[in-house]
């Protein structure tokens, strides 16, 4: 049974897309954080000093890419599950990622938050586009 509202938006697709986005961000983000922590500790940085080293662009840009990749995955999942209006479903997943991102990224630099907000919607839409059947693209 496909759960939809009167406009044809699949709630199931959106929920699964958001779960894929959040889950992907968490899994890859945690792995990235562990690798960074190990590298920093082996370079002699004390564990209590690690957080001060995490706000440099060299560290944060991969975080943006991880987030955009996870949102692309979420948009793809939403589009595939919905089987119609794939780009719209991907856009909704991306749009829902904006407030979720502020909950997680509130302590990051302003430039990071601006780029994150600007890129998350297109990433979700791109995932939805990739979910479209090839003959429809």
Which residues are covered by each model-predicted region?
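Juxtamembrane/disordered regions of integral membrane proteins
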Residues: 2-137
